[in-house]
Structures are given as C-alpha cells and as structure tokens.
Swiss-Prot record:
GO cellular component: endoplasmic reticulum; nuclear envelope; nuclear membrane
Organism: Caenorhabditis elegans
Family the UniProt entry places it in: Belongs to the ANKLE2 family.
The protein's name: Ankyrin repeat and LEM domain-containing protein 2 homolog
Subunit structure comment from the entry: Interacts with baf-1. Interacts with protein phosphatase 2A (PP2A) components.
Membrane topology per record: Single-pass membrane protein
UniProt xrefs under PROSITE patterns: ANK_REP_REGION (PS50297), ANK_REPEAT (PS50088)
Disordered as annotated region, ranges: 446-465, 505-538
Gene from which the chain derives: lem-4
Length: 603
C-alpha cells in the first residue's frame, strides 16, 4: 500500500512539474494568443509569478488576493506573450538602445514687441497709398510690421483673406513699395536687428521669409501676389516680382489658373492687349545674362527665363556675378540670336575696356533691338541690376549722389575747422607757455620747441591742452616781454589775458552789417554768420574724376532732359561733366589704376 502511494505521488509530481515547465519554457508562444496580462511584484521582480492571464478579471483576482497583496502586486498589459515573458525576465530594462532625439534649438526672442491690429491697419493704409516715408517710419520703428518672427514668415496684414504686404501692394500697383519690401527682407543687417542673432542664423531664415512673401496664396482664391499683379494689369509689379528667382510662376489658384492665365482679367484700360503682351513677356520671356568674374575678368553669356538662383549681393565678396541683363525676348531663339550678336560684336572695345566693354556693346545692341537693359554699377555698393533710363534707377543714383554730397560737405567743414584750430598750419611761430612762472621757477621761461615750419617738436596729439602766448602776434609787446620780463601781478594778468588755446588768431574784423541800424547787439559773441559756400565737386569715387565718371556720363547723356530734370543732383552732375570734351573725359584713369593711385598718394 505504501509503495502504491509513493508511485502515485511521483506521477502527480511529474504532472505538476511538466505543467509549470511548459510555462517557463523558452519555446516561442504563438503571437496570436495576445494580448495578455501579467502580475508582478513592485518590491522584487524575482518574486513575481510567471503566469499569463487572458483577461483583466483574471489578473485582478490574483492582485487582490492575499498572496498578491503580500507582494504589493500590480498588473500590466502586453501585446504578445513574448513581450510579457521578456518583462518578467528583464523588468523595465530596454532590450534595444533608445535613440535620443536631437534637442531643437531655442528660438531667439526678438527685441521688438508684436504689432497690434490698430497699428497694422495704419501700416496697410500706407502700403495701399504708396506712402514710402510713413511706410519706412513704421518699419524702422518695428521690423515686425514685415516679419512674423514666430514662424519666419510674412506678417499678415489683413486677417480675413490672410493678405501679406505684397498682396496689398500688388493689387494697388505700388511697385516701389514692393521693391523696398523685397530689399528689406533680404537685407542681412535688417534681419539681424529684427532677430538679435548673427548673420549665419538670419541667412537661413531669409530663405523662408522670402518664399513666404512671394509664393503664399491668399485664403480667398489662393492667389499669390503675382496673380494679383497679373490680374489687375500692374505690369511694373509683375516685372519686379518675376525678376526675383524665388518667385514660382507656375502656382495655380483655386480656379486652376496660373498668373499668366490671369493676365488682364480685371484690367479695363483701352490698351489691354498691350498690357497682356507685356505681362506675357515678363512671365514667359527669355533673358540674356552677362556673367563676369571680377578677379579674372572672364565673361560668359547665358539664356534663361529666370535670373540666377543665387549670386553675391556685395561687390567685395563676389565671385561670379551677373553684370548685365538684356530682355525679355518673346522666344528663346530671339534671345540666343541676341547673345550671338553680343558675343561677336565690338571685339576691340571689349579688349580695350576691361571694366565696361561688354556692357557698352550690349547697351547699344539692346537699344537697336528695343530690348530692356539693366546693368550693375559697383560704386553704388551693391550688385543690383539697374536701368538708369528709368525713374527707379535714377532714384537710386540720386540718393547716392545726395549722400556723397553730404559726405563731401562734412569732410570739407571738418578740414576747415581743423585748419582754423591748428596753430601749426598758419606758419606762426607761437611759443608754448611754461607755467613754472606761477611757482616762481624760471619766472620768464617760455620754451620755444617749434620746428622751422611752425610745428611743435613735442607730441602733437595734445594740441588741445597746449596754451600759447599770443604776445607774438603783437611785435612790440613780444619784444618788450622777452627783453624786459616783468613778474608783477599786473603783468601776469596781461599775460593770462593773452593766453589762447589752439591758434593765436588776431581778433576778427567786425562784420560788415555791424553798423546797420537793424543790427542786434544783444547776441554778442553768440552771433554767427554763414558765408555762402560752393559745394565741393562730387564724383562717384572720390574727389577726383575717374573712368567710372565717364562710363556713367555716357549712359546719362542719352536720357531725356525731361526725365533727368526730376533728379536735380543727377542733372547737375551731367551738366558739369558735359562741359568737358569727350577727349578730356576719355583720359580719366580707372579707379584702380596704379598711376592714379600713385598720384593720389603724392597729393
């Protein structure tokens, strides 16, 4: 009987261990059996049961049991039995390394506050009317009128249709406002001021801002600024927009139309056919570009419907730049014929005129072909292509000459003041006072440390702190002072009265109008007279003419007097240079000519 009981116990033990062994086996469990639940101990994973449960009810029953509560059991759901068994074997330790996502760079905080709706309505009014002065005033006070720094996109001016400033200006035909907006949002200094970061940061943002302005459709009919300009027949705006390589000319609105398809739809003028022709030419026309390497002087002509995607905007950092552009032409064949003529014509002129030979030849060919012509002028400080035969191009030149004139006047005034202040430019042998006379040391010593030309052999940097004895201006007094020094109090008082800072100038003669009965003596020494002055001559490079002046004059001389009269400084420049003969102007050397540089050094 005992033997039977032992055999029975062994059989039961084998059955029990086989059952538990199947649960602990590493044999893969069918994935179709999930999801499953497991109960585990929060305190010790080794004490966790290795049972898998099919439902929440089953696992919750164990967790709430006395055994589960004793081990502080919790349950967890898994998608497959394999995941559950891995958890029981390894706990929460990851089986594969997790990749840490890169930390996004912190967005800079603009030093400018946001623009409210009332301010934006005022801005919208100036854009619509083309009020450049007030437009620039607002943008200068807060660049966020133009840029939404939150997403590096164009600021929304009208919330309903989500118009940016280009939408509004294009619809109103404000070409100058559009050109100024595009100039500002591509200006690195403007963006650095807006974001408060560096050039590398804003260069990347500039791309997104420019694309947002040019190619963002409105919320109504999905029209871009180019759609608006084309639809309302604003040919000037169309040209400005298509000149930018970032403009996508193929975008379609909700009606499935491109900007070219919309040409003149809302235009009601009698010259509608001509306007549509010009719009077609601006959007679909072909251009001939002159590429120039300023270092080697090599040139290349290319034909394209769009300007080069990227080129340097600074003449100092340029590699290969676009120096000139002719067109647009209706067909690619016309453009290539023009390029062929440009390549073969005027070989002698191109060879002898390194700076503007190609441009001079192309300018003549463009006039003969009645094609638009634009070229760069490096002295303006940028690589922008300009048509000096247009009001926009002449406006840029006028602004440059105005600033140049101001600089010349300022330098002239500074030079005049410096000359008046400096005793050493008057040929006067003044004597530096030795203040030892106040201490009874060397009572009458006046050091004469002057060089033969009247300059002090000591440090000239401290001229502002040197006092001079102006008795030298009165020969009798000076001779008496040296031969018969007098240290009395009265003599010292007279000496101090004669002390002068800077140059020992004699008293100026009374003004001519001082005897007038209407002269106001109450102003005394605070009264100043401004004599009439002749502005110093203005040339584009410096205070002497150079070859650039002759090149510029040749272009300006072909412009109608009626147009150029709108720009007084430019008109004055042309009139003055026109008084010289062509032979005289042709002798002006290039600005970087060694002979010219050497002559300027001698001066």
């Amino acid at each position: 009987m005992g033997r039977k009981s032992a055999i029975l116990a062994v059989i039961l033990a084998i059955i029990y261990f086989r059952s538990n062994f199947s649960k602990m086996s590493n044999t893969p469990v069918q994935e179709t059996e999930g999801p499953v639940y497991v109960a585990y101990s929060m305190e010790d994973m080794l004490k966790s049961p290795r049972d898998l449960y099919k439902s929440v009810k089953e696992v919750a029953k164990f967790v709430n049991s006395a055994e589960g509560k004793s081990m502080s059991a919790r349950f967890k759901k898994f998608g497959t039995p394999r995941e559950a068994m891995d958890f029981l074997a390894y706990g929460d330790a990851p089986t594969t390394p997790k990749t840490v996502p890169p930390v996004a760079p912190t967005e800079p905080n603009s030093p400018f506050s946001g623009v409210n709706r009332i301010q934006m309505n005022e801005f919208k009014k100036y854009v619509e009317k083309g009020d450049m002065e007030n437009f620039l005033r607002l943008v200068d006070s807060n660049p966020r009128f133009l840029v939404n720094t939150g997403g590096d996109v164009a600021s929304i001016v009208m919330e309903g249709f989500r118009y940016n400033a280009l939408h509004i200006a294009a619809k109103a035909g404000q070409t100058e406002i559009i050109a100024k907006i595009l100039e500002l949002i591509q200006n690195i200094d403007f963006l650095i001021r807006l974001y408060g970061t560096g050039a590398d940061d804003v260069t990347l943002r500039k791309i997104n801002i420019l694309d947002s302005y040019l190619n963002t459709p409105d919320k109504g009919n999905s029209d871009t600024p180019l759609h608006f300009a084309s639809k309302f027949g604003k040919i000037g705006v169309v040209r400005v927009l298509t000149e930018n390589s970032a403009t996508d000319r193929t975008l379609l609105n909700k009606s499935g139309k491109s900007a070219l398809d919309c040409a003149g739809e809302r235009y009601t003028g009698e010259d509608k056919d001509m306007v549509q022709r010009d719009i077609h030419l601006a959007i679909e026309g072909f251009y001939v570009f002159l590429h120039r390497n300023p270092t080697t002087g090599s040139t290349q002509l290319t034909v394209s419907q769009k300007p080069p995607a990227t080129y340097s905007t600074s003449p100092t950092t340029a590699t290969v730049t676009v120096s000139a552009q002719a067109g647009p032409f209706f067909t690619e064949r016309e453009a290539r014929d023009f390029a062929k003529s440009w390549q073969t014509a005027g070989k002698e002129l191109k060879r002898t005129d390194f700076d503007k030979g190609w441009e001079r030849v192309g300018r003549v060919l463009a006039e003969q072909s009645e094609a638009m012509w634009r070229e760069t002028w490096h002295f303006l400080g940028s690589m922008e292509l300009l048509d000096l035969g247009s009001e926009q191009g002449l406006g840029v030149l006028e602004a440059f000459l105005r600033e140049k004139r101001r600089g010349n006047l300022r330098n002239s005034e500074i030079s005049e003041i410096s000359t008046k202040k400096s005793i050493f430019r008057r040929g006067i042998h003044a004597r530096k006072l030795d203040f030892g006379i106040l201490d009874g040391e060397k009572s009458a010593e006046i050091s004469e440390n002057l060089t033969p030309d009247g300059s002090d052999s000591a440090d000239d940097e401290d001229d502002d702190d040197i006092f001079y004895d102006t008795f030298s201006e009165i020969p009798a007094a000076a001779e008496k002072s040296i031969n018969d020094p007098d240290d009395t109090l009265g003599s010292l008082t007279d000496r101090f009265a004669a002390i002068s800072i800077f140059s020992p100038l004699p008293p100026p003669p009374p003004p001519q109008w001082s005897n007038s009965p209407n002269f106001d003596y109450s102003e005394g020494e605070d009264s100043f007279a401004t004599p009439p002055t002749t502005p110093p001559p203005t040339f584009v490079a410096d205070d002497e003419p150079c070859k650039i002046d002759n090149d510029l004059f040749e272009v300006l001389a072909q412009i109608s007097s009626e147009l150029i009269s709108k720009f007084p400084l430019t008109q004055d420049y042309v009139q003055k240079l026109g008084k010289l003969t062509a032979h005289d102007r042709s002798t002006w050397r290039p600005i970087d000519s060694p002979a010219r540089c050497d002559s300027r050094r001698k001066i």
